[in-house]
A protein has these predicted regions:
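Acidic, glycine/proline-rich low-complexity segments that act as flexible tails and inter-domain linkers
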Residues: 1-104, 116-122, 275-284, 291-303, ...
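Short coil/turn connectors at secondary-structure junctions
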Residues: 87-93, 117-121, 135, 159-163, ...
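Flexible, glycine/proline-enriched loop segments at strand-loop-helix junctions
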Residues: 123-130, 138-146, 161-169, 204-212
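Phosphate/diphosphate-binding glycine-rich loops and adjacent basic-rich segments that engage nucleotide
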Residues: 151-211
Length: 322
C-alpha cells in the first residue's frame, strides 16, 4: 500500500470521494475520464492509504456503472503487457479462476485441459491459494502442471501445450496488489470484478465470464453491449459455479455469446429434474481427489459430465469462428 501522508506525486482523491462516497442512494458516477485517471493512480500506487480505502469502500457500496467499469478495465489492461499467442485454428481462450471450490468440486482445470486437448490455447489466471477453498492452482499442481513464472513462460506454454496457468501476480502484478487488499479490508473491491473480465491477449481472445446474481448479469451485458473497447474479442457469459466460470454439473445454465454489440443465446437453460441421473463427480472436493478424478476423465476412465461437455463444445465452436 502507499504511504498515508500526502507526498509529491500523490494523486488527490477528495473530489472523487465526494461524488462516489455519498452512499448507495446519493452517490454519483464519475466521468469515464475521471474514473480512468483515478483507477490508473490506484494501480500505480499514487493514492494514499486512507484515500485508497475510502475509494474502495465507496465503490463497494455504490457499485460501478457500466461506463465506470469500462474505464477501469481500460486502465487495468494498460497496466500489464498483453500476451502474444501465435495465430492458429482457434483463438485463445481465457478463464478467470479467483473463487475456488467450497461446496462443489473445482472443475476449472478439467475444462481447461479438455479445451487444450481440442487445440484451443487456454489461459487460466487466478489466485494460488484461498483459505477454506480449493483453488485451480492447487489442482493443477497435483496434475503436474506448474504455474508460469513470467510472461514469456506463459506464452511458451500456450504455444507448446495450449495450456498455461498464470497467477495474477505474474500476469498483472499491479492488479494483484489491489486484489490482495481484501486480506486487510475484509471485503472485495472493484479489482475483483475487473480480473474476471480481463482481455489478456494482444490479439483478442474469447473470455469466459460468469455471474452469480441476475443483476450482475445485466450490468455485464450492458458493459459489453455499450462499450466496444471492453467487448473486443467477445465473451461467453453464463451463471458460474461458486463464482467459477465452469459449467454447473447439476443443471444446464444459459450460455450467451456477447459480441459485436449483441447477445446471442447459444445454449438455453434447462430445468433440473429430480428424475435426472446426477453426473459422476469426485467423492470429495479436496485437491488430491479432484485431481485424480480429473485425470481419470482425461484418460477415459470416467465420463465427462454432460453440461461440461456441452460447454467445451460451445467454446470450441466459437473460438474457431473468424
Amino acid at each position: 500500500m502507499t504511504e498515508s501522508a500526502a507526498s509529491p506525486g500523490t494523486f488527490a482523491c477528495a473530489r472523487f470521494i465526494k461524488e462516489i462516497g455519498r452512499g448507495p442512494n446519493g452517490a454519483r458516477a464519475l466521468s469515464p475520464e475521471d474514473t480512468h485517471a483515478l483507477y490508473s493512480a490506484m494501480l500505480d500506487g499514487r493514492v494514499s492509504d486512507i484515500e485508497l480505502g475510502a475509494v474502495m469502500l465507496a465503490y463497494r457500496l455504490k457499485g460501478e456503472t457500466a461506463a465506470e467499469l469500462a474505464a477501469m478495465l481500460e486502465a487495468a489492461q494498460a497496466s500489464f503487457a498483453l500476451l502474444r499467442v501465435p495465430a492458429g485454428e482457434s483463438r485463445p481462450v481465457s478463464i478467470p479462476s479467483y473463487n475456488g471450490a467450497r461446496k462443489q468440486p473445482n472443475l476449472v482445470p478439467l475444462l481447461a485441459l479438455l479445451l487444450a486437448r481440442e487445440g484451443v490455447p487456454t489461459l487460466v489466471h487466478g489466485v494460488s491459494e484461498d483459505a477454506g477453498r480449493v483453488t485451480s492452482a492447487e489442482i493443477f499442481a497435483r496434475l503436474g502442471i506448474a504455474p508460469a513464472k513470467s510472461h514469456p513462460e506463459i506464452e511458451a506454454q500456450l504455444a507448446s501445450r495450449a495450456l498455461a496457468f498464470a497467477p495474477i501476480e505474474v500476469l498483472a502484478p499491479k492488479l494483484a496488489r489491489l486484489l490482495a487488499l481484501r486480506r486487510i479490508m475484509g471485503v472485495r473491491n472493484s479489482t475483483h470484478t475487473l480480473v474476471k473480465i480481463l482481455q489478456p491477449f494482444s490479439s483478442p481472445g474469447l473470455r469466459l465470464v460468469n455471474y452469480t446474481h441476475p443483476e450482475y448479469r445485466e450490468s455485464l451485458a450492458e458493459l459489453f453491449a455499450g462499450h466496444p473497447a471492453a467487448a473486443v474479442g467477445g465473451a461467453l457469459l453464463a451463471r458460474g459455479t461458486e463464482g467459477e466460470a465452469v459449467a454447473d454439473t447439476r443443471r444446464q445454465v444459459q450460455i450467451d455469446w456477447l459480441h459485436d454489440g449483441v447477445a446471442e443465446t447459444l445454449v438455453a437453460a434447462e430445468r433440473s429434474s429430480s428424475e435426472a441421473q446426477p453426473a459422476a463427480l469426485p467423492e470429495s472436493r479436496d485437491a488430491d481427489t479432484t485431481a485424480a478424478w480429473t485425470q481419470a476423465v482425461l484418460d477415459g476412465r470416467q465420463p465427462v459430465p454432460p453440461t461440461l461437455a456441452r460447454q467445451v463444445e460451445t467454446i470450441v465452436r466459437v473460438a474457431r469462428q473468424d
